[in-house]
Structure formats: C-alpha cells, structure tokens
Amino acid sequence: MPKTMHFLFRFIVFFYLWGLFTAQRQKKEESTEEVKIEVLHRPENCSKTSKKGDLLNAHYDGYLAKDGSKFYCSRTQNEGHPKWFVLGVGQVIKGLDIAMTDMCPGEKRKVVIPPSFAYGKEGYAEGKIPPDATLIFEIELYAVTKGPRSIETFKQIDMDNDRQLSKAEINLYLQREFEKDEKPRDKSYQDAVLEDIFKKNDHDGDGFISPKEYNVYQHDEL
C-alpha cells in the first residue's frame, strides 16, 4: 500500500475510533444523569397518584440552575389558569414527565433536571435557555384525572353510547373539566379548544371522533 494511502487509512480509522469513543462517553455521561426530586409538601391523604397517560392540571416555574434566573412561569399565561397536559407523551420536556410521575393532587415538588432530560446542547427560546443548561422547576399539582385517551374517558364522554364523540359531547366534557379548577374559562376559549381538538383528531372530517381517531396512544382496546 502506498505511503499516502496508508496514512489516509490510518487517519480515517483514528477518527472513526475517536468518534465511537466520544459517543460512548457521552452516552455514559447521560446514563449517569438523573432528575432529582425534592418533595416540598405531600398531602396526608393521597389515594390517587399520577401515571403516564393521566391528564394533569398544574402550575410550575422554571429557573436556570446556573444563576437562579426565572425563564418560565405558567401563571403568566392563559389568564393565570393552571396548565392542562397529558403526562408521559411528550407534551412537556422529558424531565418534567419524569418529575411529575407519582404525584398526588395538592403535592408540591422542587426538581433539578439535567440537560439530557431538558433542551440538551441546542438550548431553547432564542438563548433564554442556553445549551447544556441544568434547569430547576417548582411544581404544584392541582388535579389528576383519567387521560383523555383512556377507555373510561371515551365512555364517559360518549353520552349516547353510539361509539363516536360529537362536538356537543366533547364540549360538555370540556366544560365539566374546566369547572374543576374553579376558574371557568371564557366561552371563546372553550370554543377554540373544541375546534383544535376536531382539527387534530377528526381525520375523515365527518364531524365525529371515532374510537380509532380518539385512541392515538394505540394501547387501549375500545
């Protein structure tokens, strides 16, 4: 093999092995990182705890661990109403999905989330969250209900038992859920939520949501 080719071959092998080593080291570092959870308050009576697929209602504030500066406050959005989201399906960062598992309604937590469970090397929000940032969240959970895609919830919404959900049925369900946090929404807000639900789920455009369209998690038999 000519010297030039031999050198090039060794050069390529070196960088391949270096890349493999770097990737393995990064994977090892990420595997040692974990979400740290501090329970600030937990109600004495806790008969129901949060799990993947549940619908949660919570407020949370986010801070940069580096300097303690606040980058997010849920109370400044949606007229101060707590946020509704489904746990464990990617509606929040992975670290929050982990941190809010096994929580009771009324519980408060302070959690530390490493970059690999937050925004990683990319950062977020045009520099508001820099690359490789460790985040701190203070969380207060208000309600844990059956996820919107569970069998039980589908049957609860389907008032006439025709195995499809109409706009009237879902509108009534939303109204009941919004009333649970004792902060009734304006009708225009509820209408916007209803429109968004059908836009994202009524795939055939027939004005109803079928069991197949409803069950996006594909793990329940309807």
Curated annotation (Swiss-Prot):
Glycans are attached at N45. A motif (Retention in the endoplasmic reticulum) lies at residues 219-222. It is found in: Endoplasmic reticulum lumen. GO terms for molecular function: calcium ion binding; FK506 binding; peptidyl-prolyl cis-trans isomerase activity. Its EC number is 5.2.1.8. Residues 145-180, 189-222 form the EF-hand domain. It is an enzyme of class 5 (isomerase). The keyword Transport does not apply. The keyword Transcription regulation does not apply. It comes from the Eukaryota. It catalyses: [protein]-peptidylproline (omega=180) = [protein]-peptidylproline (omega=0). Its main location: endoplasmic reticulum. Ca(2+) 2 binds at D202, D204, D206, E213. Residues 1-23 form the signal peptide. Residues 200-222 are annotated as: Disordered. Residues 53-145 form the PPIase FKBP-type domain. Keywords: Calcium, Endoplasmic reticulum, Glycoprotein, Isomerase, Metal-binding, Repeat, Rotamase, Signal. GO terms for cellular component: endoplasmic reticulum; endoplasmic reticulum lumen. Pfam families: EF-hand_5, FKBP_C. Ca(2+) 1 binds at D158, D160, D162, Q164, E169. Binds calcium. PPIases accelerate the folding of proteins during protein synthesis. This is Peptidyl-prolyl cis-trans isomerase FKBP7. It comes from Homo sapiens. The lineage of its organism: Eukaryota, Metazoa, Chordata, Craniata, Vertebrata.
